[in-house]
């Protein structure tokens, strides 16, 4: 659009973001303040959307890109952590080894796109049998698992950015940290095109420069 190239980026921008509001909302609101002429149409979902068929301009997802029709840029990394409330650990004890989780209430996340449970990234002894953890609760949104864990009802495996505040205030405690082997990456994906409109370009650049920069500054405080 000619008007877009001659002035501030404008127009409707359709984006899909995962259900990680505490991570993305500060950057998203800052983008809206910086580019008020860009109209955001936001879909919050953990499902694997078809970027092109569903008409999205940009989506944010984890993992490695698999669609050759899409371009991508990494946003930053995160780690999964096992957390529980002090009250829960006082009542049930602190697990010292991964195998001890079999005697605990375990709160699991189910991937909406596949229906599979998200594996807990526990490093066990070579040759050890795969742990069959109790499924005290299964939920397709991590936010609910955070609430249940904070209420003292079990141990949850959640991204570090979701539990950082609760850990800092003592509402949650990390367990089995030395047995966790995980690093995930968030990426922005958009349809491959010779022409990248200004509204898409500024959104990508803004999120790359802001999203995990905010997170790193919080870690340093």
Please give the residue ranges for each predicted region.
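Hydrophobic residues within well-ordered alpha-helices
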Residues: 101, 147-152, 167, 188
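Central regulatory/effector-binding core of bacterial HTH transcription factors
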Residues: 11-71, 220-221
């Amino acid at each position: 659009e000619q008007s877009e190239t001659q002035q501030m980026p404008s127009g409707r921008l359709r984006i899909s973001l995962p259900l990680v509001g505490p991570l993305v909302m500060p950057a998203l609101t800052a983008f809206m303040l910086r580019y008020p002429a860009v109209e955001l149409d936001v879909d919050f979902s953990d499902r694997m959307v078809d970027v092109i068929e569903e008409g999205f301009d940009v989506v944010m997802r984890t993992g490695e890109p698999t669609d050759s029709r899409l371009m991508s840029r990494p946003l930053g990394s995160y780690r999964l952590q096992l957390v529980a409330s002090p009250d829960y650990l006082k009542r049930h004890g602190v697990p010292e080894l991964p195998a001890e989780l079999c005697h605990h209430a375990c709160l699991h996340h189910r991937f909406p796109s596949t229906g599979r449970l998200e594996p807990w990234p526990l490093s066990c002894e070579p040759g050890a049998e795969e742990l069959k953890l109790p499924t005290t609760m299964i939920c397709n949104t991590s936010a609910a698992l955070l609430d249940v864990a904070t209420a003292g009802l079990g141990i949850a495996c959640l991204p570090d950015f979701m539990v950082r505040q609760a850990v800092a205030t003592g509402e949650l405690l990390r367990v089995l940290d030395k047995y966790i082997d995980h690093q995930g990456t968030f990426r922005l994906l958009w349809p491959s095109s010779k022409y990248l409109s200004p509204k898409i370009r500024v959104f990508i650049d803004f999120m790359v420069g802001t999203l995990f920069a905010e997170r790193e500054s919080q870690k340093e405080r």
